[in-house]
């Protein structure tokens, strides 16, 4: 199967390169009868859009999304929805210098080994620019899930470098350029990013995504488990190197009687499981964490080779993010929404109704 | 799509419950012409098989696998391969006591919410017993990949509780009951497990899986990336709560110039990426780590409710593993083999050959 | 994707060769809560089973089916259902003579070109023996659809050679060895088959399948249309060379005002469309016709070549059906049931419920 | 899975309605390294394009196709290819009169039953306008197959009404407005169509598609057989009611010794099978026939009901084809190309190379 689709009943297929004519996608499986407009999608596209502060690349992307099909008189028809976002403000010439080089940490080397050639302009298809359509598709899923059963999917920056942010206030998240929920971290984050900018370096981050009001029963064991599909979707985001559900790697040193979530007639007493038991949602909030590596394009020179095997030293400045993890918040929300939407539809299909 | 299949060109579909008549699977997509026998599969099934030491459940499972189709005169024919493993030594009566209870940490609650009922005997389909067929399927993939391009897939215990094991000696891994590569950890692990057994508790673990000689080019961006499919496959293993590729969560506090793997004419100077760049294998060893939670069935009593909402205190002794992570080593190897096999075939299909 | 699966939400995967150890399958996607027993499946297996008359091969196949999983206390659990049918009464030695020959009309040649080798015993995987599991899977779908919304799926022989049978009496269908609904054809059919048997020849047939009480709305345009999926499923039956929906090829010479089915407040005035409009069920009976070629193994000698290219004349007697179309009736019913079941679940998943 | 995709390794996904903003698609799985331009696609789009004669609807569709991604420096990159065709010349107001009516023979009724509403403008998604993208996708597959192994896929009109056309001259096909290969039929066809136009009626047709130089071995039994996938793809074309492979329905009255294709050291002596044995290509030309119903929109009045159940008489003139079968030739060629391309890649993936 082509690698550019995700989901079964709710299926998102995308195309587009960093410096191509446009990015686009087809969203298949949206039930008919839901009000939907381009504005519904633009909200999250704007949250993802860089250029709003010094913390992310100054490259200005006017990501205006167009819905080309699947809507009639303002309502979804149940047919496939075509999405289009034109590319603008491209400085392809910036990339001439790396056309024959493999930028360490980037996909240049592996793409060329796989395809025998590559679109070197801004990383081509391997650029995070591709996530624009993921965010638009996720916005459709978010809206459906909210209308249909009140599911609320939100994310925030949990850590940048050594600075850990606690979930103190959801309202704070949209009020600072870091998607940070912890007002006490803002100054430290500000200093960290300013210093990194000064020295032309970048840093990794941890993002947490939480879905509330998820009904119990979502997930199709033994392979299409909800946690497994979330891991797939989240790991498919550029720069993600790790995924956790609930306590994640902390379970390694936990004892059996510490880890299990006890149950009372009032519900669960804890949520170490992150809302998923045996690959199926339990009705508790679904919690996932992801680790994003630092951008590889920094001012520090490094060693690499050309397509012809010659060793060279390069400095890949470009106009890149100091912390790609920040922009990953709306992207990760979108991927969780896409997975939950798909499983919501699958669960409805398989529900019991025969005696 | 049914949730009991994994893979596209190399597709594994399974059935069977902990205490049903049998476990089985269908392996579709094995290329014709490879010598294959039941013995090839039995090796890994025995490695997974409990009962060989006090560290894992004394339940004796004689997991003899039968190949029912797809082989003619000792060679694969290219048609689907049917596998069967009969269930024996079942003590279903042991589970009468929990037929109306939800065991905390188990899938009892979520399965019943999803399906409206459940096979309570040993967890039914949610039992790790289901992984028997995964291991058999993985053995087929391992053999193909080894023959075809010398890929070698091996795993080991990297941590149990607070005891971290270093990869000092691959040969040591198969010589101790922990799949531990670090002889200096054996005594500590022995004491830890003995104490947990004495107090009837369990503990989590970390398992590392490494695939060597993986050719560059495996992975189908932007969604069926190699890292994303590995995350899906590994997270689908019972008790797994986290997956890392390469440096994983350590990247959060790394700087851009630390994380990227520099390249020379002799190859990469490091492997922070875990052998995957942009979702495509780079030719370096593919490295993944998983976190497994402690078994939830321990002697410490805990609170739960019945199907009817009544609160009760239970002790779910049964005959369970002290550290399920140990048995997860051959299972995780199998899942990585299944994913690499699928991507090896997919990559071959898409290779360039037109000018 | 492996070629041995069909369906998305209701997914049937099979294995097994004509003379292998066993045939089996995995049925994934059966909703939980339906009473199901091996007897429910055996009924159709017996209808398909040869040996009940001279009209079909004397080979006695005792197709006892075993359900190995997915049922608990007599009810489906929503997990995958494993099926097994053992092979018996094999006369593999009968096939030694053709191990190096390509039987014209059989798949010997194409299988060997594809796989580089073949299991020559009774055609191996290409044998109609494989349809045993399709019939068992179809029986599950039939039962679900009948319970869930009263859908009734039945087939009959519409033509053998030049003898056309009219649908005069459904009850007659199960009372003669031809699945013929037209009592006035029985004698002619009897004579035809006896003569063919005498001269060791075979004949083609046409089978009609009708599903009643199919709710309007099944089918997922523009590719997974109900008619397209039926065409796929029916054409996948051994020896089928043509598929029609409704009037089929008769539409070629129809005028626009003849073909369209007019509508009144009482419903449609005709059913030229065969119950499908724009790829979606209209609520009228779904009608399909298939053409089956005559068995290629007959007493008349014919020319062929060996694997080594040598020309030879062969007579492939074996113990084969005079009219394979007869046995195809329950198989075609099963394939229609599998498709309708899949689309019933898919339609439920996509139904509108948001404003 | 969403119903708007077809194929596994070569996957075509489409969107767009008759009177929406645009039609588009994503072609996933095109191997890298093939030269490809918009002109390569435009050729077939023009062949499909109406308005070139009185025989087809005067509606002028300027189907200029844009490739938005997947090509770099004139060559495919192996990433997904985005296609876009803008809609123009729309007379939506023409359809106001039928907004509350179900046009007999059209999908109005079934779409509304399924989705609870419909885009009534020109049939919305159910319009044959949707096939524009299929033709563009097919053109990519045709080019690849021609370059890669000389496969040549061509179609022609085999029958309109009672007028049967013989394959006398391939060159003639592109030289008349009927795609007719039989110069002796042209006058009769001309008179037939002129009369139908005069009386405002329409007629059915039969189209034959032949693929030459298809290598032996394409097809994945037992369900994803080449013939089964062709039946699926061809039956998914608007107005198609029947599909035949090789002799098709003629096999019903054939004897076993007539139907089988004998083999000599020079190859097969006949091609009753249509180039497919056991669901796998035999190396002979692959031959398929399809039956297309007459357009339902004609000047003759007919009975129908409104959405509210009121009986009315309608005349759905519009600007429609007298024989939709004519335009179906390039569409059917495209669908066969899409299926062969997918199976070519799948076969390459599964080929034997291990001992």
UniProtKB/Swiss-Prot annotation, chains A, B, C, D:
One Gene Ontology molecular-function label:
chorismate synthase activity
Positions that bind NADP(+) = 48
Entry's EC annotation: 4.2.3.5
Q: Ubl conjugation among the record's keywords?
A: no
Q: Which SUPFAM superfamilies match?
A: Chorismate synthase, AroC (SSF103263)
Name any cofactors this protein relies on.
Answer: FMNH2
**What's the stated role of this polypeptide?**
This reaction introduces a second double bond into the aromatic ring system.
Kindly state which reaction or reactions the protein catalyses: 5-O-(1-carboxyvinyl)-3-phosphoshikimate = chorismate + phosphate
> What is one GO cellular-component annotation here?
cytosol
Q: Does the keyword Amino-acid biosynthesis apply?
A: yes
In its UniProt entry, what is this protein called? Chorismate synthase
- Stated family: Belongs to the chorismate synthase family.
Q: How is the cofactor bound?
A: Reduced FMN (FMNH(2)).
Its annotated pathway?
Metabolic intermediate biosynthesis; chorismate biosynthesis; chorismate from D-erythrose 4-phosphate and phosphoenolpyruvate: step 7/7
**Where in the chain are disulfide-linked cysteines found?**
none
One biological-process term from Gene Ontology?
A: chorismate biosynthetic process
Q: How does it assemble?
A: Homotetramer.
- Record's keyword terms, sorted: Amino-acid biosynthesis, Aromatic amino acid biosynthesis, FAD, Flavoprotein, FMN, Lyase, NADP
Uppermost EC category:
lyase
Residues that, per the record, bind FMN: 125-127, 238-239, 278, 293-297, 319
What the entry lists under InterPro entries is as follows:
Chorismate_synth (IPR000453), Chorismate_synth_AroC_sf (IPR035904), Chorismate_synthase_CS (IPR020541)
Query: Which lineage do the record's taxonomy fields give for this organism?
Result: Bacteria, Pseudomonadati, Pseudomonadota, Gammaproteobacteria, Candidatus Palibaumannia
